Amino acid sequence: MKPVTIYSTSVCHFCNMAKEFFKKHNIAYTEYNVGTDPERRKEMVDLTGQLGVPVIRVGDEIVVGFREDVVSHMLGLSTS
């Protein structure tokens, strides 16, 4: 499986939804809290050009925000 990374903050509702989705589907992921880690925040801005969270990276694909259908497709999960 491609590596999964989420750039998030502790108070972001959609970040929490994404992390619950990963747990539900047993998807291992690396989390960076951009609210407390300025280096990772800069990395996120360099990748996306903006500060909105969550930013989810699956391999080389990046999506800003959390839409279950989009992330499922990125992960190759069945949506049925």
What is the predicted role of each segment?
Residues 33-50, 69, 77:
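Thioredoxin-like thiol-disulfide oxidoreductase module
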Residues 13, 36, 63:
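Glycine-/small-residue-rich active-site loops that bind phosphorylated ligands and cofactors
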Residues 54-63:
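A short, hydrophobic beta-strand/beta-hairpin element that forms part of a small beta-sheet core
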Residues 19, 67, 75:
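Short, flexible helix/strand-to-coil boundary loops that buttress conserved ligand/catalytic motifs
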Residues 5-9, 48, 53:
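Ser/Thr-centric signal marking residues that sit
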Residues 28:
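Residue-level detector of anion-binding/catalytic polar loops
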Residues 1-5, 75, 80:
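Extracytoplasmic thiol/disulfide redox context detector
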Residues 1-25:
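Local sequence-structure signature of Cys/Sec-based thiol-disulfide redox active-site neighborhoods
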